[in-house]
């Protein structure tokens, strides 16, 4: 397909610093390596809905270690990925089960509202059980490494920034459109087929919708890197579930350790949460920081 690309979006592919910091992302983008979610879908997980949450977290921790080993092997030999059959239950399925449980006592973000979203209760972000989408399009205004970017803007946010550029989305000035995981997966595939370099999960804020995103990528059958485009105000549990799922963490670093975060964005303890999540993201994937 013919398209007009920004010159910096072309030049960045040859930039040595960009290749050093985002080398795996570029390889997935060019189908030379496999996106994390696709590897997670091939990794066998043995668990039951009868298992306690503590037991499931332990299994998830063990599988996360195994995932990194398997990813390392597949990065060297992509053919190994094709040889492995899809198991009845996978590492990705385990993540979906864990996220389902979090919905009953919601703590995807650091506010830990603890509402049961499966019963229709709403917390600070006002996100319910079914994901609502504002818009889906090929974005040409992101960082050069990302464009054209397959952006999916979901409703709601875990913060309330007075300077928010997407206020109508984050604060529910729009109704949004409900998407089932299978339908949203088709949108992701269409964006990729049309030349988008990635699936850019944004909003608002993607954090409240992590369960729905995990369920969506269970049905995506194209190799596409996932960009987790977040305000970084998410919980340790969300950070664990993002391991082996997000290829690139596109994270905000909005504030220092003073009172600005709470005054401007209603985000108490932002500095501590933000620092911890950036350090964790740097260990688990590749990182782009917005300041």
Annotated model-derived regions:
Residues 1-92:
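N-terminal alpha-helical interaction blocks
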Residues 70-153, 167-171:
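N-terminal [4Fe-4S]-dependent radical SAM core
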Residues 108-109, 113, 150-154, 166, ...:
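Long, contiguous hydrophobic alpha-helical segments, chiefly transmembrane helices and signal peptides
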Residues 111-114, 162, 166, 279, ...:
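Generic secondary-structure signature for well-ordered alpha-helical cores
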Residues 119, 135, 161-162, 211, ...:
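Short acidic, gly/pro-rich beta-turn/loop elements at beta-sheet edges
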Residues 136-179, 183-206:
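Long, charge-rich boundary regions
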Residues 181-291:
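Conserved AdoMet/S-adenosylmethionine-binding subsite of the radical SAM
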